[in-house]
């Protein structure tokens, strides 16, 4: 089964153009989760797997592992993709997971920062950041707030793809798709300040450590969490994705159309964008009031 998985992962990289982070997630879900479970049931070949095995695995994830519906849905999606690949590659006649419905995921109220909390976060960084990382950490926060970049897009941003004179950056989205993003005045100012203090580095990345090394995703998460904590901002979600969320929310609050937000955020589907946007009761009322005939 490992050989089939290796070919599948190669397919995701070469033909689908998935990021290394996404490919790694698929690998972990199947290699460390599904395959050991199947082996314990005496199943060692992909042709031996039946629908009951997949159902049993989902039950195991629920009862034994305590996985949430979100986690189980993600793992099932990875399993379906794996077996779909084998069917399309004529290595299997049918996908044993095809008819299994994804666990129902309860909708949650969106978590986002208010305008005042955004200001408080930035002011906290100005007053409490260490001098050697202050300009860089400020640039990271401002760029996340003003462009809504994913962490991987930020850490992979190349120095050569930052054009402060034109006020734009070129980033690589999911699926290795390139996109140019405009920078507003605050973002240009923050990136310029950081550029003046940026250490020499050979890796070509825009954001680097104090010794010129690559910045990890984990480090960026820790940076955002630290300053949120110092600012006294407590949210259920407290990582960089919270800043991506407020980017979409603020655009919506400023009257930007959903399809424009979709393009700026790099979402594949408008449904994804709508999950970031909280439609207030006041907005619903105002929208319906516009339908009155005035009689």
Per-segment meaning from a language model:
Residues 1-295:
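Conserved catalytic core of the tyrosine transesterase superfamily
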């Amino acid at each position: 089964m490992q050989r089939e998985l290796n070919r599948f992962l190669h397919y995701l990289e070469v033909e689908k153009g998935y990021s290394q982070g996404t490919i790694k997630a698929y690998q972990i879900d199947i290699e460390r989760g599904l395959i050991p479970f199947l082996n314990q049931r005496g199943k060692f070949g992909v042709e031996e797997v039946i629908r009951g095995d997949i159902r049993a695995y989902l039950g195991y994830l629920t009862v034994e592992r305590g996985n949430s519906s979100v986690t189980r849905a993600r793992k099932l999606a990875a399993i379906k993709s794996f077996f779909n690949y084998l069917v399309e590659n004529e290595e299997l006649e049918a996908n044993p997971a095809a008819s299994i419905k994804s666990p129902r995921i309860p909708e949650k109220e969106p978590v986002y920062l208010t305008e005042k909390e955004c200001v408080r976060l930035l002011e906290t960084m100005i007053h409490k950041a260490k001098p050697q990382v202050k300009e860089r950490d400020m640039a990271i926060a401002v760029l996340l707030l003003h462009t809504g970049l994913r962490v991987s897009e930020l850490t992979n941003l190349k120095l050569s793809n930052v054009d402060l004179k034109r006020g734009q950056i070129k980033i690589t989205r999911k699926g290795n798709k390139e996109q140019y993003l405009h920078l507003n005045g605050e973002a240009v100012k923050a990136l310029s300040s950081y550029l003046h203090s940026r250490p020499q580095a050979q890796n070509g990345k825009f954001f680097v450590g104090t010794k010129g090394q690559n910045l990890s995703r984990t480090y960026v998460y820790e940076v955002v969490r630290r300053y949120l904590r110092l600012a006294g901002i407590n949210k259920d979600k407290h990582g960089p994705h919270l800043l991506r969320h407020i980017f979409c929310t603020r655009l919506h609050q400023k009257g930007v159309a959903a399809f424009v937000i979709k393009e700026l955020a790099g979402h594949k589907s408008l449904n994804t964008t709508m999950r970031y946007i909280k439609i207030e009761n006041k907005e619903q009322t105002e929208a319906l009031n516009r339908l009155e005939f005035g009689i």
